Amino acid sequence: MSTLTKSDMIEHLMNHLNLTRQEGRCLVENFFDELSESLIDGKEVKLSGFGNFELKDKNSRPGRNPKTGEPVAVSARRVVTFKTGQKFRQQVDERLFDQ
C-alpha cells in the first residue's frame, strides 16, 4: 500500500486538467487552507459524496503513560473528526471487494 501526498494530487491535477505545477499547487493549497479556516471559524465542512469534517471538544480524563504505566491527566482539547459519506464509503468498499 502506498501513500497519496499533496505532490501526487498536484501531479494528478496537472495531468488531468492540463494545469501548470504552480496552478495545481495553488489549487491544492487553497483547498486545504479553506478547509482549515472553516474549521477554525467553527464551521462544519460538508463535502457532498465524500464526508464531513468537524471540530469536537474532548473532556479532560485520566490517562496512563504507556512507557511507565504512571497515571497522568489528559487535558481537555479540541480535535478534528472526519466521518465518511455513504457514497464515498460504498465506492471504496466496492473497489476493495473487486480486487
UniProtKB/Swiss-Prot annotation:
A Gene Ontology biological process term: regulation of translation
An example molecular function term from Gene Ontology annotations: structural constituent of chromatin
Keyword DNA-binding attributed: yes
Record family assignment: Belongs to the bacterial histone-like protein family.
Protein name: Integration host factor subunit alpha
GO CC annotation terms, alphabetical: cytosol
Purpose of the protein: This protein is one of the two subunits of integration host factor, a specific DNA-binding protein that functions in genetic recombination as well as in transcriptional and translational control.
Organism: Psychrobacter cryohalolentis (strain ATCC BAA-1226 / DSM 17306 / VKM B-2378 / K5)
PANTHER family reported in the protein's UniProt record: DNA-BINDING PROTEIN HU (PTHR33175), INTEGRATION HOST FACTOR SUBUNIT ALPHA (PTHR33175:SF2)
